Amino acid sequence: MTITGIIAEFNPFHNGHKYLLDQAEGLKIVAMSGNFMQRGEPAIVDKWTRAQMALENGADLVVELPFLVSVQAADFFGQGAVDILDRLGIDSLVFGTEEVLDYQKIADLYTEKGAEMEKFVKNLPDSLSYPQKTQAMWKEFAGLDFSGNTPNHVLALAYAKAVAGRNIKLHPIQRQGAGYHSVNKDVDFASATALRQHQKDQDFLERFMPSVALFEQASKVIWEDYFPLLRYQILSNPDLTTIYQVNQEMAVRIKEAIKTAQSVEELVELVTTKRYTKARVRRLLTYILMQARESDLPEAIHVLGFTEKGRQHLKSLKGQVSLVSRIGKEPWDAMTQKADQIYQLGKPSIAEQNFGRVPIRIETN
């Protein structure tokens, strides 16, 4: 049987995600971000709610990406997620993308020329942002052009790099309907961005979300809910360079900007430069919010939920892979658990995220 991996945020889960799961074959394993997203923002609803949405709509097993995999630039996000899925025995990776492209060929190219390609990136001027460097590399070696806003395509290339040299086949699914950042309401499939923006529009949600009741019952948060705490973390820390990935230049810019910024968005605008993209700045602010330090990734994989089919697969992995299904006195990953505690500060109604929580079980699919 095919074992298909899917790397996702489901922020929130919508019909486009359901379409992706419907297109996937065999046993479907989702490696999902926890409570903070790849582009450096809190999830609109918590990880347990999003895992349940996925399990109700075709996923067989949902595992959590640790915080320091979840909140990373595309390449590190892709690498960390593929590492986890590889250990869970996937033989194919399904993903949505805006481009029609032979990603397998790109993975093969990277297998062959990876060292040369990385050397090319290293030699590019530092005035370029990391995404610009990566795009220059793909243009040079694979002849790829980057048109407009295609974040899923950028992630797909990161997945192609991550599966290089592994026995995992890539299966791109053409993205349906609205683009990633689109807020258009007149489409067959709405984007997660549009759903976040129109979260109070009942008809809109019902049209584009399969598990709408779960979404409506859940506590919702936005970045601004954490701004007072972020402000405190910046002002009270005498040396921001002790925080993960924050360099001297960024530390100075952030300290200066916080004097006048009245919101997270304003802070991001003030700190962003040509070299430091908005997504990168948001990630740095997320690290500051957590007081994140460089730390090792957990050995074990945290299971958020499964169907009967998923449970059988976990059983078959016993003894080969270290799995955590209940977090007790011993932490699974201290950094992720700290992030969860801070996430809960966004709204008093958010449920406990770790202690006493056990995987969600869905009997039928």
From Swiss-Prot:
Entry-linked PANTHER family: TRNA(MET) CYTIDINE ACETATE LIGASE
Entry similarity comment: Belongs to the TmcAL family.
Annotated ATP binding sites: 7-20, 96, 152, 175
Keyword Signal: no
Cystine crosslinks: none
GO CC, one annotated term: cytoplasm
NCBIfam families per record: PRK13670.1
Lineage: Bacteria, Bacillati, Bacillota, Bacilli, Lactobacillales
Domain of life: Bacteria
Name used for this protein in its record: tRNA(Met) cytidine acetate ligase
Organism: Streptococcus pneumoniae (strain CGSP14)
Cellular localisation: Cytoplasm
Catalytic activity reported: cytidine(34) in elongator tRNA(Met) + acetate + ATP = N(4)-acetylcytidine(34) in elongator tRNA(Met) + AMP + diphosphate
Entry keywords, A to Z: ATP-binding, Cytoplasm, Ligase, Nucleotide-binding, RNA-binding, tRNA processing, tRNA-binding
GO function terms (MF aspect): ATP binding; ligase activity, forming carbon-nitrogen bonds; tRNA binding
Matches recorded under HAMAP family: TmcAL
Enzyme Commission (EC) number: 6.3.4.-
Gene encoding the protein: tmcAL
Family annotation (InterPro entries): Rossmann-like_a/b/a_fold, tRNA(Met)_cyd_acetate_ligase
Function description: Catalyzes the formation of N(4)-acetylcytidine (ac(4)C) at the wobble position of elongator tRNA(Met), using acetate and ATP as substrates. First activates an acetate ion to form acetyladenylate (Ac-AMP) and then transfers the acetyl group to tRNA to form ac(4)C34.
GO biological process, one term: tRNA modification
Pfam families named among the record's database cross-references: HIGH_NTase1
